[in-house]
Amino acid sequence: MLAKVEPKRQLARFRGRSYVAFVFAPVVPIADWLEEIDSTIERSSGFFVGRPVVLDLSAVDLSCSGITHLLSSLEARNIRVLGIEGVNGSQLTPSMPPLLTGGRHCVLEHIETDKAEAKPRASSLLLKQPVRSGQSVVFTEGDVTVLGSVGSGAEIVAGGSIHIYGTLRGRAMAGVNGNLDARIYCQKIEAELLAIDGYYQTAENIDSTLRSRPVQAWLDDETLKITPLI
């Protein structure tokens, strides 16, 4: 049995390395886009709470006053904007969140080091204890394996795949560095959220027939698919 979530335009995506942020990319009409946010909040009131947001304005043409109004609209919904991208810096005022860029170019000097001192970077993380409510585990170098359960309100963020040998009640976000082949496996799904490379589904969207069953999730184009593990 395959539980397929019908493709639709994503309201937001995730982006993250040392942290995970929502990337909001508004489209016109802005009022309709805000209604989508309201619908998400209505289904899950805490979905955006405490999560930093990057506002990508590359798809809209807003004046300074328009950006101000949009920021106020998001703030009224308890959504915290960490930074803005996709606009000219002259469109922003000092009171707005900072303009995010790709960073400055730099020249790296090669420094000879003792090869014996070099240690290979771990490509996986093994957690032998349960991840309790409120805890956040971020490992962007590779896979994360949890031998226990992941509690409600807890969060696992991985650059690779996520393997949970227990119940997943919190959030699991795999492939956060753009790994389209990442997967999520768990022995019992009661998740608040599943995400791969930024494409996500919340508890309300996951097929109810899969609840409390062992499953795997993967990304097919821009559609998150979930199937039972037999």
Curated annotation (Swiss-Prot):
Entry annotated with the keyword Disulfide bond: no
Protein keywords: Cell cycle, Cell division, Septation
Stored Gene3D superfamilies: 2.160.20.70, 3.30.70.260
Disulfide bridges in this chain: none
GO biological process: cell morphogenesis; division septum assembly; regulation of cell septum assembly
Presence of the UniProt keyword Cell division in the record: yes
Signal sequence interval, chain numbering: none
InterPro entries cross-referenced by the UniProt entry: CAP/MinC_C (IPR016098), MinC (IPR013033), MinC_C_sf (IPR036145), Septum_form_inhib_MinC_C (IPR005526)
Top-level taxon: Bacteria
Role played: Cell division inhibitor that blocks the formation of polar Z ring septums. Rapidly oscillates between the poles of the cell to destabilize FtsZ filaments that have formed before they mature into polar Z rings. Prevents FtsZ polymerization.
Subunit structure as annotated in this protein's UniProt entry: Interacts with MinD and FtsZ.
Annotated PANTHER family: SEPTUM SITE-DETERMINING PROTEIN MINC
Family membership: Belongs to the MinC family.
Protein name per the record: Probable septum site-determining protein MinC
Organism of provenance: Rhodopseudomonas palustris (strain BisA53)
Lineage, uppermost ranks: Bacteria, Pseudomonadati, Pseudomonadota, Alphaproteobacteria, Hyphomicrobiales
Gene from which this protein is expressed: minC
